[in-house]
């Protein structure tokens, strides 16, 4: 794994050549400013190449403002480069936020929630054609 970039709400690192692994600090709250930071750090990490986001919320409680969720779902820059997202959850509260993000915000066509990180990675592997 490559360098780990620390953010206000957690960290992001390259799991491999095309997967950004996003981890959250426990009890973190993502507002618009932090959502922009997450986008910018992901774009910086992959230097203009398309990539997948593996959003790992296991073993933590995290929440986000509606404004942050709307931004992450609808930002043109993020949509252009982060072409699929797998969100891994292991608790009901975070699962509800993830389900809202995946089902009710229009632009999230290639976003899915999982309870198992291996299943999330397998799903991302099926999306490799989006990287072209």
Give each language-model segment a name:
Residues 1-132:
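Amphipathic, Lys/Arg-enriched alpha-helical "gate/interface" segment within cytosolic domains
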């Amino acid at each position: 794994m490559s360098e780990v970039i620390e953010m206000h709400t957690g960290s992001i690192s390259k799991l491999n050549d095309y997967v950004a692994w996003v981890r959250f600090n426990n009890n973190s709250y993502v507002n618009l400013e932090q959502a922009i930071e997450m986008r910018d750090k992901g774009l910086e990490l992959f230097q203009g190449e398309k990539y997948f986001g593996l959003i790992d919320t296991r073993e933590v409680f995290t929440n986000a403002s509606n404004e942050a969720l709307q931004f992450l779902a609808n930002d043109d820059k993020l949509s252009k480069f982060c072409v699929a997202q797998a969100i891994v959850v292991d608790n009901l509260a975070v699962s509800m936020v993830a389900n809202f993000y995946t089902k009710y915000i229009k632009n999230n066509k290639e976003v899915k929630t999982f309870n198992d990180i291996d299943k999330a990675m397998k799903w991302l592997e099926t999306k490799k054609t989006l990287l072209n």
